[in-house]
Amino acid sequence: DETHEAELTALNDLRDGLDTISVERKGDEILKLFAAPSLEYSICLMEKAKINSKIFNTCNHASLSSLIKLEKRLDIAPCAIRRLAAYTGDNLKSQLRFSKKQAKAHQILRQEATNRKDAAELSYRYNKNLALDAILVRSSLQNIEPSKNIFSQIKKGSVAKFPIKPFDLAEYFSGPRLGETLAYLEQKWIESDFTLNKEMLLATIK
């Protein structure tokens, strides 16, 4: 209709002027866009106007669409970095001058989307918000349903405290071997659903 034609015309003008806009300004506008409730409609228009190809090297509209549906169904507020992780694997720091923190979060979400850590482990290793985002991005990229107990698992991981400290192992190991054993025991504890206590864990290496 006429409204869509006018929007496309405006977007075509924007595309032609992108080369004169600073990278930082592009990054700011992309963050605002990806946090907006009407993102999917805007992305469709941008793709029609071929704007996306001037900003991103890779993009996955199907994954983004899947993520937005998940957000609505689970009543989760939009998050620009989460949505960008579902949409593109590009290096956002070099391409759009995102901050180190933003680019790192995006990188972690992309990495964890292909790993097998569950929600509890992600929450333990990072934090509750990043764990939720990682599970949602993984679900959207792999087209799978998140587990029904995702929120309780995230809560469990966020309060879990690993019972072993380096000095607990100093009697048996030193140097790199100590670090390796500590990491081994930590993973064993995580795989027990955080149930093994200090004595049980130490018994496995004596």
Where are these regions (language model features)?
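Non-catalytic interface/linker regions that flank or bridge core catalytic/transmembrane domains
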Residues: 1-15
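Alpha-helix N-cap/helix-initiation sites
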Residues: 4-5, 23, 78, 175-179, ...
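Short, well-structured alpha-helical segments
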Residues: 5-8, 43, 60, 107, ...
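Charged substrate- and nucleic-acid-binding regions of tRNA-handling and nucleotidyl-transfer enzymes
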Residues: 137-206
